């Protein structure tokens, strides 16, 4: 999994636009709701997500969360 995490973080770092994260499709870019409203996520796998805030063409407040534990 470490290689996948590094690759996804690199994609996030080099993205110029939020749309850049739509590919590959297995990123499953999502706009989050509820207590995480205003944040986005991409999937590492079925359990783990990279969650971030997008502004000024950059990802901010990046963190990795266990989706099943919040």
Q: How would you label these PLM feature ranges?
A:
Residues 1-9, 13-25:
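A charge-rich, low-complexity, intrinsically flexible signal that marks solvent-exposed coils, linkers
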Residues 16-40:
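A short, surface-exposed loop/turn module that caps and links secondary-structure elements
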Residues 33, 37-70:
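Enriched for short, Lys/Arg-rich terminal
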Residues 6, 16, 27, 59-61, ...:
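Functionally constrained cores in energy, signaling, and assembly domains
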Residues 2-4, 11, 31, 55, ...:
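Generic secretory/membrane-interface signal
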